[in-house]
């Protein structure tokens, strides 16, 4: 699923990338958030994780199409994979979680430095509550929630957590 432009731009704004050097995009799907981040911040190192094999080709195609090479696409189950070979993120966007949101947040919270940001777009009450619970239980503070209705249907809650 492609993250719609208003949602993507607000998510990137909440990630506060201007003084950061490494961003992770977990569950990147088509890579729209990674590509937009790289376009806005060309020096930003972007590491994008996706479970589905087809994601790699989508990321390559989209990064080439929009002229932003240098995004590292990693294919595999984020929760299960070792992450020590990747640069430590200062900002993380969760685009997809495959029903394992709490496990993802736990793993990310262990890696984020103090002041690091985590942004999640919730399309359901259940996923919003799950994110809030995961944040509270893993040393993160929910700093901001923005409800965005890009159209008349399907409002999206964009949640920002920060590691203290």
Q: What positions do the PLM features span?
A:
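Short beta-strand element of Class I
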Residues: 43-49
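Conserved class I S-adenosyl-L-methionine
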Residues: 20-29
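S-adenosyl-L-methionine
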Residues: 49-88
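Glycine-centered, small-residue-biased loops immediately flanking beta-strands
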Residues: 21, 44, 116
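Conserved SAM-binding loop of SAM-dependent methyltransferases across substrates and taxa
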Residues: 30-42
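A short glycine-rich, Lys/Arg-flanked "PGG" loop and its adjoining helix->strand segment in the class I
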Residues: 103-117
């Amino acid at each position: 699923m492609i993250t719609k432009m208003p949602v993507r731009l607000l998510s990137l704004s909440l990630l506060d990338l201007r003084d950061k050097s490494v961003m992770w995009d977990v569950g990147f799907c088509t890579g729209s958030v990674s590509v937009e981040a790289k376009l806005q911040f060309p020096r930003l190192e972007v590491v994008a994780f996706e479970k589905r094999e087809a994601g790699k080709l989508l990321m390559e195609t989209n990064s080439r199409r929009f002229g932003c090479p240098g995004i590292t696409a990693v294919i595999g189950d984020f929760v299960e994979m070792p992450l020590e070979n990747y640069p430590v993120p200062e900002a993380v966007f969760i685009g997809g979680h495959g029903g394992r949101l709490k496990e993802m947040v736990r793993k990310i919270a262990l890696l984020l430095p103090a002041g690091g940001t985590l942004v999640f777009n919730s399309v359901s009450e259940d996923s919003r509550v799950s994110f809030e619970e995961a944040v509270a239980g893993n040393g993160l503070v929910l700093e901001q929630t923005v409800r965005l209705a890009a159209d008349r249907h399907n409002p999206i809650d964009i949640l920002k957590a920060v590691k203290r």
